[in-house]
């Protein structure tokens, strides 16, 4: 059954759903969602992102992460987390620049927050030659908080469903 048919059936059986729930399902449903069923990003996809235009963007993010780690006192462990890493280009560029500080790379626990299996595969390919191998989680609440976190989130807000609130008084 198609996603459209499943959504229609669910609405008939249980009543209205919020726009946010509807958009979330349309984007991330594992069997019919936009990000789960097609390459959305890149030359063959529907859009490109800043890291795909120039490696300088990701490299500057990498240098910023190293500097932030140093300002944190160069802790022995730090979680470098990217939310919605697309095809992995930004992180690949960031890690390449971060090689200037091998101590930073030794401290990094790289975590990518990505629910889409096709995008996880693309990220794995992009980061295959990296000095650090990522760990994937599906959501931010899966990140451990026993070490400092450096969070990167480029172009992720436009992938989130909007929630509407109405003030009545």
What are the functions of these language-model segments?
Residues 152-169:
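A mobile, often basic/glycine-rich helix-loop segment
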Residues 1-83, 87-148, 165:
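Rossmann-like AdoMet
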């Amino acid at each position: 059954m198609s996603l459209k048919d499943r959504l229609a059936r669910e609405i008939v059986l249980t009543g209205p759903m919020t726009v946010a729930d509807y958009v979330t399902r349309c984007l991330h449903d594992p069997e019919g969602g936009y990000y789960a069923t097609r390459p959305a990003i890149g030359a063959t996809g529907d859009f490109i992102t800043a890291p795909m235009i120039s490696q300088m963007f990701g490299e500057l993010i990498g240098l910023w992460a190293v500097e932030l780690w140093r300002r944190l006192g160069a802790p022995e462990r730090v979680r470098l987390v990217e939310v919605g890493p697309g095809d992995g280009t930004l992180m690949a560029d960031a890690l390449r620049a971060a090689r200037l500080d091998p101590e930073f790379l030794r401290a990094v626990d790289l975590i990518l927050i990505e629910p889409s299996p096709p995008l996880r595969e693309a990220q794995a390919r992009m980061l295959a030659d990296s000095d650090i191998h990522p760990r994937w989680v599906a959501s931010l609440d899966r990140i451990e908080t026993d070490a400092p976190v450096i969070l990167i989130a480029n172009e992720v807000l436009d992938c989130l469903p909007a929630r509407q609130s109405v003030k009545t008084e």
